[in-house]
């Protein structure tokens, strides 16, 4: 029943609406990921109230994901009601990555193109990588040209700390330096030596 309920809202209906858990305002829906495959877009972007960010995040972030499955209904006053508690939202926010002081859910990172700071496409994120129950990196399927030019495997890991920003409209995530420099980072070297959990 709950599932049917939230299937019927599209992002246009939810944009700029305030989100509540009971009487607590969590934030405002500001959009969602630009991805050609709608089924892949499982989260919306929410601008989080600063008191909520302070209380429910390890380190406050202004923008965070809101899983679509948590949307229960639109109330009579036009606000969005969530089906779960703040505790559940907090749990979801712990399961994110932080880039440029914004939080991203794993589903928002998958399939994103990875570019270096010169605009060269390195490859596409296939999944995220955890160390001690925390996402520390992404697994990237590299482009053929990159494999040839840099003698790298068809899959490699890039640490989250190597990213400087995302480009929402283009569904890209951008490295803070050239790919050549990324390959020399101690964090890059160590993450590629670790066994996956």
Protein language model annotation of sequence segments:
Residues 1-197:
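Peripheral interaction segments used for macromolecular assembly
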């Amino acid at each position: 029943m709950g599932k049917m309920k939230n299937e019927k809202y599209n992002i246009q209906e939810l944009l700029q609406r305030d989100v509540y858990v009971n009487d607590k305002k969590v934030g405002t829906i500001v959009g969602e990921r630009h991805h050609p495959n709608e089924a892949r877009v499982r989260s919306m972007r929410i601008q989080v109230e600063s008191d909520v960010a302070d209380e429910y995040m390890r380190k406050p972030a202004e923008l965070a994901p809101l899983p679509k499955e948590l949307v229960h209904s639109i109330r009579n006053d036009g606000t969005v009601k969530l089906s779960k508690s703040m505790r559940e939202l907090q749990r979801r926010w712990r399961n994110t990555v932080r880039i440029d002081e914004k939080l991203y859910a794993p589903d928002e990172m998958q399939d994103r193109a990875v570019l270096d700071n010169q605009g060269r496409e390195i490859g596409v994120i296939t999944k995220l990588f955890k160390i001690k129950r925390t996402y520390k990196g992404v697994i990237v399927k590299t482009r053929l040209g990159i494999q040839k030019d840099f003698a790298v495997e068809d899959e490699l890991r890039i640490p989250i700390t190597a990213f400087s920003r995302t480009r929402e409209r283009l569904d890209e995530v951008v490295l803070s330096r050239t790919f050549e420099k990324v390959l020399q980072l101690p964090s890059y070297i160590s993450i590629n030596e670790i066994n996956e959990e």
